[in-house]
From Swiss-Prot:
The lineage of its organism: Eukaryota, Fungi, Fungi incertae sedis, Microsporidia, Enterocytozoonidae. Component of the cytosolic iron-sulfur (Fe-S) protein assembly (CIA) machinery required for the maturation of extramitochondrial Fe-S proteins. Part of an electron transfer chain functioning in an early step of cytosolic Fe-S biogenesis, facilitating the de novo assembly of a [4Fe-4S] cluster on the scaffold complex CFD1-NBP35. Electrons are transferred to DRE2 from NADPH via the FAD- and FMN-containing protein TAH18. It comes from Enterocytozoon bieneusi (strain H348). Its main location: cytoplasm. It is found in: Cytoplasm; Mitochondrion intermembrane space. This is Fe-S cluster assembly protein DRE2.
């Protein structure tokens, strides 16, 4: 081999090797499976209940059944408390299912 071939090989070797300064290291992804796609980035987080929860954030308000504070909501308006959701409705039998959507 001639000296020019050796010089070219040396230049090629220097051009293809990259010495990175560890102080300026950028984390590299070694597998394409670790790259987040747009669908992975946009996932909704589940609402998690905290320990000793008092805010009831995790409960579904649509499926909760109202429980009377005073216990006399079925008797009619004169016996209902001020925050009663049954206010304005006629008296009903205790234990009857009341659907507000039909009103």
């Amino acid at each position: 081999m001639t000296s020019s071939d050796e010089e070219l090989k040396e230049l090629l070797k220097q051009a293809t090797t990259y010495k990175q300064d560890p102080r300026h290291r950028i984390p590299m992804v070694d597998r394409p499976s670790k790259i987040l796609t747009q669908s992975n980035k946009c996932r909704e987080n589940k609402a998690r209940k905290c320990s000793n929860c008092t805010c009831n954030k995790n409960t579904n308000t649509n499926n909760t059944i109202y429980k009377s504070k005073c216990g006399s909501c079925h008797l009619g308006d004169p016996f209902r408390c001020s925050s009663c959701p049954y206010k304005g409705l006629p008296p009903f039998n205790e234990g009857d299912e009341i659907n507000f959507d039909e009103l």
